[in-house]
């Protein structure tokens, strides 16, 4: 919760064995949600590591267990490399796509008394954010936006902090829809925001009439696309910080690897001369929003 609300790294400390096992579910959730998290846990003494001797705190394959649910997992083998491992783990947790990184510290290393090094006060975590990305691809995206009249942004978890940028794209004539994780990027009372009603029949029919859909920071995961059977526009552009997102669930006409904030800012600067928005298009989006809200309220009456 701290990491998600503060944009800082969360830190959790557990005991070894059952303590480490109990945090597995939370690490899975943090990884899925892209939450930057540093998990520190214990381990048996160095001389007993990986021998499966049943010594106190001995948990076979604990490091592998942590690796399976984290972005990565490290073991501090000596008090001499504490700072090095911490820096590496923090950097990895903060590098997009962000997520949890685990560190296990053998009990004898924990008990080692060391002098605090001056370098501990000057730790700088490198910002590895992917910047704007390929300018040639941005040229192609600009061209597609200029050609389109009926266009929509699909905002996922990776774009949920882009309130200002999304509002500017509404000024360019974009409607907005979100995944569940992307909710709150703008006020859902906004007339051009369809909320997270992204897979209902009326909205799917609406998709078929669109010239363009731009997906920002969303997996388009099965839960929100009817296991990838939801029909999305053929002219689909995907913007994501994760290179593995390309064609993972849906084929995209254009995939752009870059920081969503910087990409949308750059595109808006190119496109802010677009002023003549079709009033009929705006009216259609507003009418659809009223319909789906009415349908949902009727549905809730059953409960």
Walk through the language-model features, giving the residues of each.
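Structural signature of the thiamine diphosphate
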Residues: 4-14, 20-41, 67-120, 144, ...
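Gly-rich Lys/Arg/Thr-decorated short loops/hinges at beta-loop-alpha junctions or inter-strand turns
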Residues: 46, 65-69, 113-126, 187, ...
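Phosphate/pyrophosphate-binding active-site segments
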Residues: 80, 116, 232-303
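Active-site-proximal loop->helix
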Residues: 43-68, 188-192, 251
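Glycine-rich, anion-gripping cofactor-binding loops and their flanking helix/strand elements
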Residues: 1-4, 155-237
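Acidic, glycine-rich active-site loops and adjacent beta-strand->loop/helix elements
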Residues: 15-20, 41-48, 158, 180-185, ...
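A short, well-structured juxtamembrane/interface segment
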Residues: 133-144, 302-303
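Flexible glycine/proline-rich, aromatic-decorated loop/lid segments
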Residues: 55-64, 231-241
């Amino acid at each position: 919760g701290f990491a998600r609300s503060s944009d800082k790294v969360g830190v959790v400390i557990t005991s070894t064995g059952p303590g480490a096992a109990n945090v597995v579910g939370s690490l899975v959730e943090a990884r899925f949600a892209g939450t930057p998290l540093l998990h520190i846990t214990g381990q048996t003494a160095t001389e007993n590591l990986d021998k499966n001797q049943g010594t106190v705190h001995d948990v076979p394959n604990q490091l592998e267990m942590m690796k399976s649910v984290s972005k990565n997992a490290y073991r501090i083998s000596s008090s001499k490399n504490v700072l090095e491992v911490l820096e590496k783990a923090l950097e990895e947790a903060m590098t997009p796509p962000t997520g949890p990184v685990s560190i296990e510290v053998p009990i004898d290393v924990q008990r080692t008394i060391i002098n605090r090094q001056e370098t501990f006060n000057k730790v700088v975590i490198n910002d590895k954010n992917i910047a704007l990305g390929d300018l040639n691809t941005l040229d192609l995206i600009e061209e597609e936006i200029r050609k389109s009249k009926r266009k929509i942004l699909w905002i996922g978890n990776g774009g949920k902090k882009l309130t200002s940028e999304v509002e500017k794209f509404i000024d360019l004539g974009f409607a907005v829809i979100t995944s569940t994780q992307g909710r709150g990027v703008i006020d859902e009372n906004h007339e051009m925001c369809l909320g997270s009603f992204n897979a209902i029949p009326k909205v799917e029919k609406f998709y078929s009439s669109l010239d363009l859909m731009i997906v920002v920071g969303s997996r388009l995961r099965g839960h929100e696309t009817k296991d990838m059977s939801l029909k999305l526009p053929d002219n689909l552009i995907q913007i994501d910080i994760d290179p593995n997102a390309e064609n993972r669930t849906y084929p995209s006409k254009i995939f752009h690897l870059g920081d969503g904030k910087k990409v949308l800012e750059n595109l808006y600067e190119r496109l802010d001369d677009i002023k003549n928005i079709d009033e009929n298009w705006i009216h259609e989006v507003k009418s659809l929003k009223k319909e789906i809200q009415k349908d949902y309220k009727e549905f809730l009456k059953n409960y």
